[in-house]
Design a protein with these regions (language model features):
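Peripheral membrane lipid-binding modules
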Residues: 2-29, 33-35
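Conserved flavin/dinucleotide-binding core of flavoenzymes
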Residues: 109-126, 130, 234-237, 465-466, ...
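Mid-domain catalytic core of redox enzymes
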Residues: 113-115, 119-121, 130-133, 374, ...
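Beta1/beta-strand and adjacent pyrophosphate-binding region of the FAD-binding site
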Residues: 127-145
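Glycine-rich FAD pyrophosphate-binding loop
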Residues: 154-182
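Dinucleotide-binding Rossmann-like beta1-alpha1 core, especially the glycine-rich loop
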Residues: 183-265
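A short alpha-helix-loop-beta-strand transition element characteristic
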Residues: 201-223, 283-287, 437-440, 461-462, ...
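Active-site/ligand-binding neighborhood in enzyme catalytic cores
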Residues: 252-399, 407-410
Length: 615
């Protein structure tokens, strides 16, 4: 029996790791003890108990009490429930009830002492989730992946996974999603936007954010810096002939290569650079794909895996013999397959656009967390994982109230791979070693503002800066990876007459940025912008925010998928079925892929628990 099998009717009564059950020789009955607690010694006794409070393993504690005795103790406690209002007036408090128990088998009566703690805020007990002390799933990590997995389980798989909790080591949810609002500005210091796929739109609608969605102008141009000039990027392949970013010869090479007139695939896993140069030519790589890799992954395309980082494009060649052949085959298969009806609740974005929310991306994790309510546990740091004899898991946490343990049928680890590696080390060196191999380079998000008149005239359209933003190939000599025109992309991001720019700097090819000061990073960004976008004579920018992420974006390097499979196989080999890996190093780094991956993991958890139910 677990201590957490009893759930108090009082919502802030803590059971589980904060219950001590001991056999005691104290010869007083319940009425005497209650009289003592409520008398003049009340204050001193409460303070002494708080100071001496110990946290013990629930299983060890329960082994000291007979099951029948504990049941009788619980019954007596319920009979004294009228004390709950008095108990909640002191927080935190420990009150001891000494229950005089009748022997169930004629043996000398034992004395059971039950200590309860009154906690501030929501209960920390897992038993509060389902009343039994064992939950169906614990999602470790309250970033966007973890929250979306929990939301997907709650909305799509409630019948098979009714009881889910999310634990987050920090005091807030959202992971790298960080929205700041100040002095009329609203900016992001992590991800900036998302592709409005049906998955992320469903998540937004289910979270009550349909009316908060904002979508960018689908016609807003994207620019790449090439030879000192910002050049628009073709929005689709058919636009390629009409843009000056590439030469006529480069366009021909790309077209013939896409049709399959190019060298055959090699016998090894290709990097992004190898794949693109072979299929589409040098110009496409150098002027489009290389800056795109820098903008999305902050990565080095000579090391990124095409199969892992851009698997959908890689697969086209596999299924169709060429990029065009695979595209045609994919369209045919899609047209021939029965198409499920689209959720009528979802908005219909127009064209190639991006999305956010009226008050920034943080609205999504905040809304999901609010819907999950007390099932989201903040400031819960996972310290150990163990497998129980009944094939369930025991997770032990450091919490603001002390140690707490949760017993669960399944676990989804959405924390960064390097953190998961440390937790798995005592269980599997192979799994821990595999997860430790993933590389996260540093990236800094630098947000600045200029007045509209500070921009070069040739960069304005009808007197305004319009567009999504600009990317900078490494060969062009700028340190910043790219710049997003935040106030042009979404409304109400800056005061009238001001332009808000979000700049990313660092990445796999420039890891030294983590040693720079904030002022040095602002100077680097301003220096680069004056070479391209800002009038060199303009005044210094208003520096709003600098956020350095020391380990920002997992790199999907060559061998990434094999390493991930090694970690998963190692967990299966030690009997850790029901232990799932999630997060951006599994699903992909784009916000939309994190949400799509969340639905996929939720389905896997549901399938696992459904199978377990029939065993």
């Amino acid at each position: 029996m677990e201590c957490s099998t009893y759930t108090s009717s009082q919502p802030n009564l803590v059971w589980g790791e904060n219950i001590d059950v001991e056999i005691s020789g104290v010869g007083r009955n319940i009425t005497e003890e209650l009289r003592d607690v409520s008398g003049g010694k009340k204050e001193r006794r409460m303070q002494r108990l708080v100071r001496k409070r110990e946290v013990n393993e629930a299983g060890r504690l329960m082994s000291t009490a007979r099951n029948e005795s504990f049941k009788r103790a619980v019954s007596l406690y319920r009979a004294g429930a009228h004390l709950s209002s008095a108990m909640t007036t002191v927080s935190p408090t420990s009150i001891i009830h000494l229950f005089k128990l009748s022997p169930p088998n004629g043996r000398p009566r034992a004395q059971t002492r039950v200590r309860c703690s009154i906690a501030e805020g929501p209960t920390i007990s897992p038993s509060s989730v389902d009343g039994r002390g064992t939950v169906d799933c614990v999602v470790v990590g309250g970033g966007i992946s973890g929250l979306c997995i929990a939301q997907a389980l709650a909305t799509k798989h409630r019948d098979t996974v009714p009881n889910v909790i999310v634990t987050e080591a920090r005091d807030q949810v959202g992971g790298n999603i960080t929205t700041v609002e100040r002095d009329g500005y609203l900016w992001e210091e992590g991800p900036n936007s998302f592709q409005p796929s049906d998955s992320i739109l469903t998540m937004a609608v289910d979270s009550g954010l349909k009316d908060e969605l904002v979508l960018g102008d689908p016609d807003a141009p994207r620019f790449v810096l090439w030879k000192g000039k910002l050049r628009p990027v073709p929005a689709k392949p058919t636009d390629l002939p009409f843009f000056d970013l590439m030469s006529f010869g480069g366009k021909l090479r790309a077209g013939f290569g896409a049709l399959g007139i190019r060298p055959p695939p090699p016998g090894h896993e290709e990097s992004v650079e190898e794949f693109v140069r072979r299929n589409l030519g040098d110009e496409v790589f150098e002027r489009l794909i290389e800056p795109f890799c820098s903008g999305v992954y902050a990565g080095d395309p000579s090391k990124l895996s095409m199969k892992a980082a851009f698997g959908r494009v890689w697969k086209l060649e596999q299924i169709g013999g060429s990029i065009i052949g695979g595209t045609v085959k994919t369209i045919q298969e899609r047209n021939n397959a029965p198409k499920p009806p689209r959720d009528p609740r979802l908005p219909k974005p127009k064209g190639q656009t991006v999305g956010s929310f009226r008050k920034g991306l943080s609205m999504l994790p905040d809304a999901i967390s609010k819907r999950l309510g007390s099932n989201v546990k903040l400031s819960w740091k996972l310290t150990s994982i163990s497998k129980l004899d009944n094939q369930e898991y025991k997770l032990t946490y450091e919490t603001p109230e002390g140690l707490a343990s949760v017993q669960t049928k399944s676990v989804v680890m959405t924390i960064p791979s390097y953190t998961a590696s440390n937790l798995f080390r005592p269980l599997s060196d192979v799994a821990a070693g595999a997860l430790s191999q993933f590389f996260y380079p540093p990236v800094a998000a630098v947000t600045v503002s200029y007045p509209t008149e500070a921009f070069r005239a040739e960069c304005l359209i009808d007197g305004e800066l319009k567009g999504f933003g600009q990317l900078h190939p490494r060969s062009q000599g700028l340190e910043t990876l790219g710049t997003i025109y935040s106030s042009s992309l979404f409304p109400n991001r800056a005061p009238p007459g001001r332009v808000l720019l979000l700049n990313y700097i660092g990445g796999a090819t420039n890891p030294g940025i983590k040693f720079k000061t904030h002022s040095e990073l602002v100077e680097a960004v301003d220096r680069d912008l004056r070479k391209v976008l800002i009038d060199p004579r303009a005044k210094e920018p208003l520096a709003l925010g600098v956020r350095i992420w020391p380990q920002a974006i997992p790199q999907f390097l060559v061998g990434h998928l094999d390493i991930l499979d090694t970690a998963k196989s190692a967990l299966r080999d030690i009997g850790f079925r029901g232990m799932f890996l999630g997060g951006n190093y599994v699903s992909g780094v784009a916000l939309g892929r994190c949400v799509e991956g969340a639905y996929e993991v939720a389905a896997e958890v549901s399938d696992f628990l459904s199978q377990q139910a029939y065993k």
